[in-house]
Amino acid sequence: MAITYSSKPSKQRKALFNMPLHLRHKLFNAPLSKELREKYGVKKLPVRKGDVVRIMRGDWKGHEGKVVRIDLRRVRLYVEGVQRKKADQTPVYYPIHPSKVMIIKLDLSDKWRRKIIERRKGLIESEVVEEKETSKTSEGGGKTIEETEGEK
């Protein structure tokens, strides 16, 4: 996903920091677990409140929990059970970057999210069908399988 057309790091960072919130949501993509990937046919989806995630990197690696809150401004999410204590012993959630988690259970209570999954699944299936069709025609020297069988 190109944030800007410039290759300069300073302009890349500037575009990231000044990105509007409705576009910043795209930065929350996280991979799905193997089971979910096979079930829905999608590799990545944006993390939402209510999803269950597994932390894959950092001090909290291996922890699983429900996403409690998402901070679009800081591009961080907060997971249930991942907390630190402040000096006065009050617990606060530890911020985690969405690229460091894997979604293990989706919250499909939103009909729009189901539509997104269906749309992405359809794109993937159509790409697979196109690849199969091109491989069939390339094997027979530009002829389809039916044409080559008719010549025999």
Curated annotation (Swiss-Prot):
Q: What SMART domains does the annotation carry?
A: KOW
For this chain, one GO molecular function annotation is:
structural constituent of ribosome
Q: Report the domain of life of the source organism.
A: Archaea
Keyword hit for rRNA-binding:
yes
Region of interest (Disordered), residue spans: 128-152
Instruction: Report what the protein is called.
Output: Large ribosomal subunit protein uL24
InterPro entries in UniProt: KOW, Rib_uL2_dom2, Ribosomal_uL24_CS, Ribosomal_uL24_euk/arc, Ribosomal_uL24_KOW, Translation_prot_SH3-like_sf
State how it assembles: Part of the 50S ribosomal subunit.
One Gene Ontology cellular component term attached to this UniProt record is:
large ribosomal subunit
Determine if Ribonucleoprotein is one of this entry's keywords: yes
Query: What family is this protein classified in?
Result: Belongs to the universal ribosomal protein uL24 family.
Cite the entry's keywords alphabetically.
Ribonucleoprotein, Ribosomal protein, RNA-binding, rRNA-binding
Question: What's a single GO BP term from this record?
Answer: translation
Query: PROSITE patterns from the entry?
Result: RIBOSOMAL_L24
One Pfam family, short name please?
KOW
